[in-house]
């Protein structure tokens, strides 16, 4: 089984690899590192560099 991770933006919003991000057409199971460079936090608009992996 593949371990899915969660990443939290500085604003507090969490990207869950299990769920993806439907509002940006990111399907469930998409790894954070596979997100497009254009990915932005849907809450605050910051890019991938504003996220950190959480337990």
UniProtKB/Swiss-Prot annotation:
Residues 4-54 form the Rubredoxin-like domain. GO terms for molecular function: electron transfer activity; iron ion binding. Its cofactor is Fe(3+). The keyword rRNA-binding does not apply. SUPFAM superfamilies: Rubredoxin-like (SSF57802). PROSITE patterns: RUBREDOXIN_LIKE. One of its GO terms (biological process) is alkane catabolic process. It comes from the Archaea. Fe cation binds at residues 9, 11, 41, 44. Coiled coil: none annotated. Keywords: Electron transport, Iron, Metal-binding, Transport. Binds 1 Fe(3+) ion per subunit. Disulfide bonds: none annotated. Gene3D superfamilies: 2.20.28.10. Transmembrane segments: none annotated. Rubredoxin is a small nonheme, iron protein lacking acid-labile sulfide. Its single Fe, chelated to 4 Cys, functions as an electron acceptor and may also stabilize the conformation of the molecule. Belongs to the rubredoxin family. This is Probable Rubredoxin-2. It comes from Methanocaldococcus jannaschii (strain ATCC 43067 / DSM 2661 / JAL-1 / JCM 10045 / NBRC 100440).
């Amino acid at each position: 089984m593949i371990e899915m991770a969660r990443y939290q933006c500085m604003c507090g919003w969490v990207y869950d690899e299990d769920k993806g991000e439907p509002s940006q057409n990111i399907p469930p199971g998409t790894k954070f590192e596979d997100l497009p460079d254009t990915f932005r936090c849907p809450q605050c608009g910051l890019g991938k560099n504003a996220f950190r992996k959480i337990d």
